[in-house]
Swiss-Prot record:
It catalyses: a quinone + sn-glycerol 3-phosphate = dihydroxyacetone phosphate + a quinol. Pathway: Polyol metabolism; glycerol degradation via glycerol kinase pathway; glycerone phosphate from sn-glycerol 3-phosphate (anaerobic route): step 1/1. FAD binds at residues 6-34. Residues 574-586 have a biased composition (Acidic residues). One of its GO terms (biological process) is glycerol-3-phosphate metabolic process. Up-regulated by glycerol and no inhibition by glucose. Its cofactor is FAD; FMN. H.volcanii contains 2 glpABC operons, one located on the main chromosome and the other on megaplasmid pHV4. One of its GO terms (molecular function) is FMN binding. SUPFAM superfamilies: FAD/NAD(P)-binding domain (SSF51905). This is Anaerobic glycerol-3-phosphate dehydrogenase subunit A1. It is found in: Cell membrane. Pfam families: DAO (PF01266), Fer2_BFD (PF04324).
């Protein structure tokens, strides 16, 4: 039997997992390596917009046309990852009438359904819009869960025979005889079925073809291979509010600018964004003024944002690219199109292609085109099926809205579980009995946590990505330790505590940019719960000295404290004090 050609995909974001799925469905032998969790890079740090294309209808019509086409595809194949909120491009009195008309005309030229609404009609859809807005354009924007989408693509790839290796960092590209023949990876700390090496272990993975799908990090992979990939990373801030101040994507209808979009996402709203070029996608300043800008500017569209509660902020890095010699200075002017860089044609280095640019909405189209390219290189004749075959969990998830009573769940919890799990809800929610809620903010049940642990091992941040547990208002104050409890008794205490610490630190990275008002009070409560009540600042398990538990008081006999509130014991102590102290009391 003839061996299938092998392809190595570098990068576990939406594009990388989409490529792995596409190639695996065509029958190729696929391995994907990712240095962290899936969605470690740009995919896990975006505002969750499913583009209609309206944002690019004036400035970048090729990208706009790609967006509306893929918007329709994703609604069909990934319904459990998408919420069709609709979108509004809102004009304020100071915004240009000419630009408004250009936006409307551009949408229609690109095949994007667009309807003009009066201010009153727009406020019927979103009552909290500013009272002085002029009008709006309605478009089919939506919200997409990038974590769920990425995991679903990876799961489909595995179902079709692909191998996924997380926590495996590429540290070199293997070049022999003037051709790329594979990569060297160094395995990092991690657990679960997708971790295939010991921490620090170095492994060579050889392949017939290598795809560099690392986005903003593509230049670093290019350096390993001795070629120049001119990615221009551009950072943007996103600020998360505690509730959904709007249920529709709200855009400012004006030319390019910072702080011009509000995306309702799950139980929150995400405000975005800035666009500032950086040299290193791993190391750049996260500045408070950027967060302030989001709130101050977008309050002009939705005034209640000025006094709303901010729960965290985070930054992501766009993998922008333009052909050499273009010379664009402002990153907002760089196209959002994607590019395939065939290093055989471009750099006389066969065996590797890089894919750069683009956006999450068009990930599947990007994956299809590079998969066509790889198949042509390898002489494989196989059609793409990813636009027609639903992702795991997406086949018939609407019927799951009736599961609440069956599983003894409060209906909001059942509804949220069905939305997250899609057609897998029956299987997962029946797997644990009893099935209490672990994360109240996001309505995540124990069954969902256990299901996520099947692939996450001890990585609680991976559980967070899959379920949204710890991503609500309290940012894990109430549920983080509950999540860690689910690791016992399979894992020892040291391992569980280390996993819990990693989850806390990941939560803290974004919380520290939102410490004012009500959220500061929430953070103080979280600190008191964990640092004081749970003694996490002075962890006795980490102390060198052994604890003499025999020296502790035995306490009240069972039921005593409930029966008399401890009054009898207090009276005994008072009598002892009056007598100068009894044995053992000093």
């Amino acid at each position: 039997m003839k061996k299938s050609p092998s392809v190595l995909v570098i990068g576990g974001g939406s594009t990388g997992t989409g490529i792995a799925r596409d190639l695996a469905m065509r029958g190729l032998d696929v391995t994907l390596v990712e240095k962290g969790n899936l969605t470690h890079g740009t995919t896990g740090r975006m505002h969750g917009l499913l583009h209609s294309g309206g944002r690019y209808a004036v400035s970048d019509q090729p990208s706009a046309k790609e967006c509306i086409e893929e918007n329709r595809v994703l609604r069909r194949i990934a319904g459990h990852c998408v919420e069709m909120t609709g979108g509004l491009f809102v004009q304020r009195p100071e915004d240009s009438d000419e630009y408004f008309e250009k936006k409307l005309e551009g949408c229609r030229e690109c095949g994007i359904p667009a309807e003009v609404l009066s201010a009153e009609e727009a406020r019927e859809i979103e009552p909290y819009l500013a009272k002085d807005i002029k009008r709006a354009i309605k478009v089919p924007d939506g919200a997409v869960d990038p974590f769920r989408l990425c995991v679903a693509n990876a799961a489909s790839a595995v179902e079709h025979g692909a191998r996924i290796e997380t926590h495996s960092e590429v540290t070199d590209v293997l070049v022999e005889g003037g051709e790329v023949v594979g990569v060297e990876v160094t395995h990092q700390t991690g657990t679960g079925p997708y971790v295939h090496g010991e921490p620090g272990e170095v492994e060579e993975i050889r392949a017939d073809y290598v795809v560099n799908a690392t986005g903003a990090w593509a230049g670093q992979i290019g350096d390993f291979a001795g070629v120049n990939v001119e990615v221009r990373p551009s950072k943007g801030v996103m600020t998360i509010m505690n509730t959904r101040q709007v249920d529709t994507v709200v855009n400012r209808c004006r030319p390019k600018g910072d702080a011009d979009i509000i995306v309702p996402h799950e139980t929150t709203c995400i405000l975005g964004t800035t666009d500032e070029e950086v040299e290193d996608p791993e190391d750049y300043p996260e500045e408070g003024w950027e967060v302030d800008l989001m709130i101050e500017t977008l309050s002009e569209l939705v005034p209640m944002l000025a006094d709303a509660r901010t729960i965290r902020s985070f930054w992501g890095v766009r993998p922008l690219y333009e052909p050499p010699g273009t010379g664009t200075e402002d990153p907002t002017d760089i196209t959002r199109e994607f590019f395939l860089l065939d290093h055989a044609d471009r750099d006389d280095l066969p065996g590797m292609t890089s894919i750069v640019g683009g956006k999450l909405t068009t990930y599947r189209m990007m994956a299809e085109q590079i998969s066509d390219h790889v198949c042509e290189k390898l002489g494989v004749d196989a059609e793409c099926r990813t636009a027609d075959e639903p992702l795991p969990g997406s086949e018939d998830f609407t019927v799951l809205r009736d599961y609440m009573d069956d599983f003894g769940l409060r209906s909001p919890i059942g509804r949220r579980s069905a939305q997250r799990l899609g057609s897998r809800a029956d299987e997962v929610l029946n797997s644990v009995d009893p099935n209490p809620v672990v994360c109240e903010c996001e309505a995540v049940t124990r069954a969902e946590i256990q299901d996520a642990l099947d692939t996450a091992g001890t990585d609680l941040n991976s559980v967070r990505i899959q379920t949204r547990a710890s991503m609500g208002n309290c940012q894990g104050a109430i549920c983080c330790h509950r999540m860690a409890n689910e690791l016992a008794p399979e894992y020892d205490e040291k391992t569980v505590r280390a996993s819990l610490d990693d989850l806390y630190q990941e939560r803290w990275k974004g919380e520290r940019h939102a410490m004012w008002g009500t959220q500061l009070s929430q953070t103080a409560l979280k600190h008191m719960l964990h640092a004081a009540t749970m003694n996490r600042d002075e962890d006795p398990a980490a102390a060198d000295a052994d604890i003499d538990f025999a020296a502790f008081d035995d306490g009240v006999a069972s039921g005593g404290a409930v029966a008399d509130g401890g009054r009898e014991r207090a009276a005994d102590r008072a009598d002892d004090d009056a007598l100068g102290g009894a044995d053992g009391d000093n």
